[in-house]
Amino acid sequence: MIASPYPPRLLIVEPNERALGVMAKRFAEAGYRVVACDRPTSAIAELHRQPTDLVVAELRMPGLSGIELVRMVRDDSVLKETPVVLITGRSDASGAIDGFGAGADDVVAKPFDFSVLIARVANRLARARSFRELREDNAALDARVITRAIELGETRAALQASEAELLRLQKMVGRA
């Protein structure tokens, strides 16, 4: 179970309605907010409609494959950071290789133990959260560096003005 007042939102894309229902139920039982789509095109629309923390998608789907879905997510400036886990029924390594080549964060082969899939999803979500926090911290540090550089520039200008005033006063005292 996820210990958070706002559980992560998962988008599950699976053309087989029975498999989609089972996965949606299992992820919901694990504490996730689940949006289920049976078509990749409706999944893309859903991704643009509301922020999603992670996508779980079948590799082989009619119309738009899981590989193409991953590429669309990675090519979208708003969605590109969204983790994607692909599920493949292919028994050879080519499904995983193709998935990773397209930019998938993980590829899980069928049949799989659902508790392992949940653990993989939790792992990807934790990494995404860490990267997001790191980016936010870096942005805050960058802002502090800029602010401090401006403050130092202003202090330097004030010191230079004071130095010029001291030199002027020294010249006046030297003339007297």
What would you call each of these model-derived segments?
Residues 112-121, 125:
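C-terminal output helix
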Residues 31-39, 46:
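Short hydrophobic/Thr-rich beta-strand motif most characteristic of the beta2 strand and flanking loop
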Residues 68, 91-106:
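Alpha4 helix (beta4-alpha4-beta5 surface) of REC/receiver domains from two-component response regulators
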Residues 2-19, 23-27, 40, 55-56:
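Conserved acidic segment of CheY-like receiver
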Residues 135-176:
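C-terminal output/effector regions of signal-responsive regulators
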Residues 38-39, 65-68:
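Acidic catalytic/metal-coordinating carboxylates
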Residues 45, 67-80:
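Short amphipathic alpha-helix used as the core "switch/output" element in two-component signaling
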Residues 58, 88:
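Active-site residues of response regulator receiver
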